[in-house]
């Protein structure tokens, strides 16, 4: 090769190399290219969505009571080893699967490890190990949206836009944090709000503790007498809202909110007839021989025991079926239906949009033209069905001087950062349905029922108590041929100045270990000490 050709070749190589250097210099000087390169080596991680919480009437949290920690794990056997002992089985499996991963990830740990050089971020655990009112609050689906209860009914408020906080992690090709740089925590405002309920956390805890000790199936409701605000709602058995799948095959329907379901009522309905009689100016006497015959059908008092000469007060205290059958005949079907409807039977009670109690069932006027059906209705049997929520509203009307209020649950929405009230939920209107004189007379009769009648298991409380028992036939039998009963107690406490209306139902029982009146008494004792 001639010298001239060699020189030309070297010149070409030199110019080519110079061009490459110029291009590299150009690229390095362009900030947009630098930004793109940085973005390509930045890993973005999302933290769990911030969901609005539930709060009690005093602003105390009902959800998010426990904190959990999410550790930001960068590749490296040392990090995996340090985290392995601080996480649960699911976290350990994640660490094992990610041992060869070239990118950071989040894993839940049981403590804050920031001081040990592992960045950690706090998040609330939605449901505590001992969750409160799971059937009422509900639970979330796999996407973090409400699947049942108030979680579902108020999902839009609690979720907001669903925007999540993010972590921007500048990493090397191996997935480690780049030297001299830090993780950026970008906080998002989803617009989610908290919801304050009328529940009282302390009353709810007390009711749940009593139910756990005394009941296998059933519910307990507690209302504030003056406002009909729901202070506690317990349904047993319960379930873990953090792991609802674990209870899918569990017996006795743990997902069922028994407070909102309709049941056969029994003698706890008798105050309705007593109210109708007092409003009509009737207070007859009756000589009970233990049974009454209506169109050839025999209706017996409990155990067929005669009560002798009884007036309205004694008949209510002794739960005399014969007296109330005769009273129903004297009042007539129309008067009974009107009184029952005025006290809330036969109409549903909405606690939130999308969360409504069953309406129950009132017999029709035509059905009650049959004397046997009227007799059944007069002591709370037959086709009559009612929810514990309806029964609580009826008893609360008596305790509140004859003023009916539908029970309510929602108070207002909250700014969770400041605790400031944002907007109040509408409350049901009050309606006088009994005269003050009728309500006062019924309160005295119900006090006597506890002091001397069928509800003596609720006697001896400080300040006294008042209420009515009920044992309702269901027409359902066990394999051994024993009929399942619904065992009720509805009353208020203290009798001298009622603060709480309480309903206890044990459903589908053949024989309860503790009577519903005794369950009521245990809860009243707890409420007395709460002050």
Predicted segments — roles?
Residues 1-245, 337-342, 505-531:
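Periplasmic/cell-envelope proteins involved in peptidoglycan metabolism and beta-lactam response
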Residues 61-63, 224-267, 275-508, 531:
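Beta-lactam-recognizing serine transpeptidase/beta-lactamase-like catalytic domain environment
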């Amino acid at each position: 090769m001639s010298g001239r050709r060699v020189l030309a070749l070297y010149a070409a190589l030199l110019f080519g190399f110079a061009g490459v250097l110029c291009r590299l210099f150009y690229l390095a000087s362009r900030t947009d290219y630098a930004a793109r390169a940085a973005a390509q080596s930045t890993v973005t991680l999302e933290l769990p969505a911030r969901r609005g919480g539930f709060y009690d009437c005093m602003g105390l949290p009902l959800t998010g009571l426990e904190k959990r920690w999410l550790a930001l794990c960068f590749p490296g056997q040392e990090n995996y080893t340090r985290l392995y002992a601080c996480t649960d089985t699911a976290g350990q499996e994640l660490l094992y699967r990610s041992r060869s991963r070239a990118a950071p990830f989040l894993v839940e740990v049981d403590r804050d490890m920031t001081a040990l050089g592992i960045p950690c971020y706090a998040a609330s655990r939605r449901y505590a190990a001992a969750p409160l009112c799971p059937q009422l609050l509900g639970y979330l689906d796999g996407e973090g949206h409400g699947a049942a209860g108030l979680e579902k009914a108020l999902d839009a408020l609690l979720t907001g836009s669903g925007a999540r906080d993010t972590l921007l992690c500048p990493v090397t090709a191996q997935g480690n944090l780049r030297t001299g740089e830090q993780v950026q925590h970008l906080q998002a405002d989803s617009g989610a709000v908290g919801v304050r309920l009328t529940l009282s956390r302390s009353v709810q805890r007390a009711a749940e503790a009593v139910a756990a000790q005394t009941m296998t199936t059933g519910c307990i409701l507690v209302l504030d007498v003056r406002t009909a605000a729901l202070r506690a709602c317990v349904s047993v058995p319960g379930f873990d809202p953090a792991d609802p799948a674990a209870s899918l095959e569990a017996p006795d329907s743990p997902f069922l909110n028994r407070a909102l379901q309709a049941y056969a009522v029994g003698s706890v309905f008798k105050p309705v007839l007593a109210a109708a009689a007092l409003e009509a100016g009737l207070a007859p006497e009756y000589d009970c021989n233990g049974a009454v015959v209506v169109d050839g059908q025999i209706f017996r008092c409990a155990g067929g025991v005669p009560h002798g000469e009884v007036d309205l007060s004694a008949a209510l205290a002794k739960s005399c079926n014969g007296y109330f059958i005769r009273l129903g005949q004297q009042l007539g079907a129309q008067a009974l239906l009107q009184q029952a409807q005025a006290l809330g039977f036969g109409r549903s009670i909405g606690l939130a949009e999308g969360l409504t109690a069953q309406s129950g069932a009132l017999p029709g006027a035509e059905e009650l033209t049959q004397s046997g059906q009227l007799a059944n209705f007069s002591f709370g049997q037959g086709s009559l069905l009612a929810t514990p929520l309806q029964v609580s509203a009826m008893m609360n009307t008596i305790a509140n001087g004859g003023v009916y209020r539908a029970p309510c649950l929602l108070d207002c929405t909250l700014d969770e950062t400041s605790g400031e009230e944002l907007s109040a939920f509408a409350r049901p209107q009050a309606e006088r349905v009994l005269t003050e004189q009728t309500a006062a007379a019924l309160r005295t009769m119900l006090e006597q029922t506890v002091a001397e009648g069928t509800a003596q298991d609720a006697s001896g409380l400080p300040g006294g108590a008042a209420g009515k028992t009920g044992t309702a036939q269901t027409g359902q039998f066990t394999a051994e041929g024993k009929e399942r009963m619904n065992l009720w107690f509805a009353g208020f406490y203290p009798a001298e100045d009622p603060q709480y209306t309480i309903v206890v139902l044990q459903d589908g029982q053949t024989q309860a270990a503790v009577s519903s009146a005794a369950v009521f008494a245990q809860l009243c004792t707890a409420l007395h000490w709460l002050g």
